[in-house]
Amino acid sequence: MKLALIDGEHYPDVNRWAIEKIKPCCAVFVGGTEKIGSIRDIEKALNIKVYHSPNIFEALSKAISENNITEVIDLSDEPVLTPNLRFRIASYLLKLGITYKGADFEFRAKEWKKIDIPSISIIGTGKRVGKTAIGGFVGRTLKELYKVVIVTMGRGGPEKPEVIRGDLMEITPEFLLKVSEEGKHAASDHFEDALTAGVITVGCRRCGGGLAGFSFFDIIDEGIEIAKSLNPDIIVFEGSGPTFPNVLADGFITITSAIHGTEKIEQYFGPLRIGLADIVVVTMADSVSEEKLKRITQAIREINPEADIHLTRFVPRLIGEVDGKAIIATTNPQSAKKFSEELEKMGIEVVYYTGNLAKRNILKDELAKVNYDDTAIVELKAGAVDVVIRHAFSRGKRVVFLDNEPKNIDGKDLKEAVINLARRIVNDKGN
């Protein structure tokens, strides 16, 4: 059934004229009183039930809960509904799988899929927010309690779902170089998660991403079936950039970077990603001011008051031993500098650092000019395998992988929060 959004900037007879054309079962009054007397006057004029509340979303929630709404038609306009508020409404409706349609726009959610195995979805408000680092953290946290399978969907993922037994094999630089030489993207997320979490991963691919975060093409359905066949206690889905699987998981962890501020949270379809969250992880919180962190926290709470917010920073976690002088390569110049300083405090002599893993040509030029004695320390991202590892091996150097470990700066415990979320989900499903 259809629901109409109406306002008091239109005369009641104009609203009635439009309502008769679209024939909704009910309406939500979204504000504006310039051309009306009272809500009762509108109800009499329209002859349908009109829901209203000072909070638009409370009125929408009540209308949707009492009616089988599949489509919301927006008959309002500015100044009552601003573009930002319309995106908030769209985010709210797409979360519920309801189409939102206006005079010159239509937002239609991909069908949300449900699975019978307990699941958590890790999604991001954008690229380079630390989503895969959190994915690995969640995987290695939960493997202490459950059999975990992580399902990824990357732009460099395989054409057919690929299983990596991170629980049984060691992900070595030599192995990844061989994978790269076979023409595969050896730094794809399912390899990184297998490396950092030590769990089974299923790599999938996707192409294209819509405004709300749904992909144009993906093979996630095939990936789900393979994941289920591995008999996990819990499946962890991991998005790609701002795009994520259209799986209505039992729990959501949304990742946003403090460096991005509130824009990715409040604007466009940021409210959808925040609104889905049980836990919101704010990464790189040590890189911004206290005032900016307060604004970020307030923005999250305004959209999702129930979300458990964690302010975190990343610290380097080495997967292997480092001896002698080393270089470090990451995808971010700021993190490269910061990590080099932290590794120096650990007794490692860093002779060069670069944040150009995602810029292969620049990276190659840098490495050609650098002399180092022993080890290349590298994140498993972008050009890590086909540039850094290949270069290091050609010079007889060792490679040690670098992981980004989240640490709370707010006195809270992200590990405990992840465990509690998983326990609730598993218990609710009776596993």
UniProtKB/Swiss-Prot annotation:
* Taxonomic superkingdom: Archaea
Task: Kindly list the GO molecular function terms attached to this UniProt entry.
Answer: ATP binding; cyclic 2,3-diphosphoglycerate synthetase activity; ligase activity
This protein's UniProt keywords = ATP-binding, Cytoplasm, Ligase, Nucleotide-binding
InterPro entries in the record: Cyc_diphosphoglycerate_synth, P-loop_NTPase
Annotated compartments: Cytoplasm
A GO term from the CC aspect: cytoplasm
Q: What class of enzyme is it?
A: ligase
Q: Which reaction does it catalyse?
A: (2R)-2,3-bisphosphoglycerate + ATP + H(+) = cyclic (2R)-2,3-bisphosphoglycerate + ADP + phosphate
| Entries under SUPFAM superfamilies matching the protein | P-loop containing nucleoside triphosphate hydrolases (SSF52540)
Q: What is its EC number?
A: 6.5.1.9
The principal localisation class reads cytoplasm
One GO BP: gluconeogenesis
Q: What Gene3D superfamilies is this protein classified in?
A: P-loop containing nucleotide triphosphate hydrolases (3.40.50.300)
Family membership, please give it. Belongs to the cyclic 2,3-diphosphoglycerate synthetase family.
Q: What does this protein do?
A: Catalyzes the formation of cyclic 2,3-diphosphoglycerate (cDPG) by formation of an intramolecular phosphoanhydride bond at the expense of ATP.
Instruction: Report the protein name in the record.
Output: Cyclic 2,3-diphosphoglycerate synthetase
Give the organism, scientific name: Pyrococcus furiosus (strain ATCC 43587 / DSM 3638 / JCM 8422 / Vc1)
